[in-house]
Amino acid sequence: MNDIQSKILCNLKENELLSQRQLAKNIGVSLGIINREYNGLISSGLITEGGKLTKEALKNIKNNKPKQAIILAAGYGQRMVPINMDKPKGLLTVYGETLIERLIRQLHEVGITKIYVVVGYMKEAYEFLIDKYDVELVINREYATKNNLHSLAKVSNHLDCSYIVPCDIWSSSNPFSMYECNSWYMMSDLSNPTSDLRVNKQFHIVLKDKRNEGNCSIGISYINHLDAKWLKERLVSMAEKTRYDNSFWEDCLFEGEGYRIGAKLVRHEDVHEINTYEDLRDIDEESENLKSDTITVIANALHVSNSEIKNIQILKKGMTNRSFLFECQNQRYIMRIPGE
């Protein structure tokens, strides 16, 4: 079953009355493609001529029903300078709600209550989640020297029918579902010239070519029952090798000229990855976390508003480093924090 057929089945599980035209709109492909794949599902015995799911289709959906989630929250988010020393990224607030609590709430809405949160930097700040949401915290003590491939390896026994979620995602609608069939990795429809990956018409994630720009990676993923086994084996194997210390977990997905799993393509207006101070300001200029003493010092010294401070970049890598470059009124500056 290909990725488009998987999406058709999941849509029909939620509403068997959907027409092919409605399916095309929901999935984001042409009516002709839906008609072709719909007929393929009929030929495969997964839906009837009348559009009903067969026992085989229902069995497939049941076997791959989401049952748990992993939230990656170990990193210290050095690109969030100057506020990354005060609070871990997952606890930044957007519209009065922390990022990680919104994700947990959205998971609960689709029946996912078994949630593992991999923590490292400022791990104590997340402990309230244990009593409030009954999550399990898993500690990655190597967060300062190794990337999130190693965080995911810590919970490799919990990949089966699991969502993998970065803690710095804000989605206007619920990105999770009660029903899944195939594994997927979330990509945005926004073109990104710096990305090496793009989504083709078959929803495959492939290396971009000279004719096509890449798509933005979002980072949320779903791993079904079938794919959990090989992903676990690859994670554990790569985590044992020092050359993968700086690798993202997505490196495990590569096979040949692209990812081994397909894409879930979303509108860029709906899902936001908050990597920087400016990302946070763009989505919620009233966020309490924007009230940084460092930004206030700059604004007062240059007699400008906070919004005129742009293109903030860390000066050098390092967990304790807070000095950064920034631009203001077409001039570049360095903000050096005393004591460094």
What are the functions of these language-model segments?
Residues K13-E16, E56-A69, C216-V297:
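Conserved alpha/beta core of the MobA/IspD/sugar-nucleotide pyrophosphorylase nucleotidyltransferase superfamily
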Residues V304-E327:
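ATP-binding glycine-rich phosphate-binding loop
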Residues S172-S247:
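Conserved core of the sugar-phosphate nucleotidyltransferase
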Residues I42-G51:
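A short, conserved structural fragment
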